[in-house]
Swiss-Prot record:
Modified residues annotated as Phosphoserine in this record: 101
Hydrolase keyword on record: no
One GO cellular component, as annotated: cytosolic large ribosomal subunit
Entries under HAMAP family matching the protein: Ribosomal_L12_arch (MF_01478)
Matching CDD domains: Ribosomal_P2
Originating organism: Candida albicans (Yeast)
Highest rank taxon of the organism: Eukaryota
Lineage: Eukaryota, Fungi, Dikarya, Ascomycota, Saccharomycotina
Family: Belongs to the eukaryotic ribosomal protein P1/P2 family.
Pfam family, one: Ribosomal_60s
GO biological process, one term: protein heterooligomerization
InterPro entries from the UniProt entry: P1/P2_N_sf, Ribosomal_P1/P2, Ribosomal_P1/P2_euk, Ribosomal_P2
Keywords: Phosphoprotein, Ribonucleoprotein, Ribosomal protein
Protein name, as recorded: Large ribosomal subunit protein P2B
Gene Ontology MF terms: identical protein binding; protein kinase activator activity; structural constituent of ribosome
Length: 111
């Protein structure tokens, strides 16, 4: 992902056909080592392709991926014991607390 981001950054900066050395120089300028094999694989995959078409294709693929969770309406719709509903609410609060504690999900900009 970092190689693709560097490639796109160079293209946006005016370099219409970034080379492996261009991408390596950009990554090293921010302290990231470039793996030559991955970089060559990316350049081979992008060779002869229009970036705008690739971005449009990626957007359609991302749109088809489910990204939201199901609504938690089971506890409010049930007519069971109050203790059962309280236990479910407690579990939801614990899940929310876990989600909030991992905001960056362990990813950096160029990791």
């Amino acid at each position: 992902m970092k190689y693709l981001a560097a490639y796109l950054l160079l293209v946006q900066g005016g370099n219409t056909s970034p080379s492996a050395s261009d991408i390596t120089a950009l990554l090293e300028s921010v302290g990231v080592e470039a793996e030559e094999s991955r970089l060559q694989a990316l350049l081979k995959d992008l060779e002869g392709k229009d970036l705008q078409e690739l971005i449009a294709e990626g957007n359609t693929k991302l749109a088809s991926v489910p990204s939201g969770g199901a609504a938690a309406g089971g506890a409010s719709a049930s007519t069971g014991a109050a203790a059962g509903g309280a236990a479910e609410a407690e579990e939801e609060k614990e899940e929310e607390a876990k989600e909030e504690s991992d905001d960056d999900m362990g990813f950096g900009l160029f990791d």
